């Protein structure tokens, strides 16, 4: 995990009903690199989005889904999800504006 830069940590935002409801409390949900830890996620959010201050980070590992194609069975890749709580005086994240 030595060569992962901050822009490689956050892969994409998670846009669901629950994550949209949490945005009112300044909680934002992202899919992150599977090897990223909480401090790396905090640093990446603060560097990528100017004016944001992270209060806490909650992470969860998600197993891959079972898929079939004919007789062949397999699984999709594992993913990691992070819920980032911003401080009260922090700016909003612009990527979620207008959703």
From Swiss-Prot:
It holds the Pfam family Ribosomal_L23. InterPro entries: Nucleotide-bd_a/b_plait_sf, Ribosomal_uL23-like, Ribosomal_uL23/eL15/eS24_sf. Part of the 50S ribosomal subunit. Contacts protein L29, and trigger factor when it is bound to the ribosome. Keywords: Ribonucleoprotein, Ribosomal protein, RNA-binding, rRNA-binding. GO terms for molecular function: rRNA binding; structural constituent of ribosome. Transmembrane segments: none annotated. One of its GO terms (biological process) is translation. Belongs to the universal ribosomal protein uL23 family. SUPFAM superfamilies: Ribosomal proteins S24e, L23 and L15e (SSF54189). The gene is rplW. Gene3D superfamilies: 3.30.70.330. GO terms for cellular component: ribonucleoprotein complex; ribosome. One of the early assembly proteins it binds 23S rRNA. One of the proteins that surrounds the polypeptide exit tunnel on the outside of the ribosome. Forms the main docking site for trigger factor binding to the ribosome. The keyword RNA-binding applies. This is Large ribosomal subunit protein uL23.
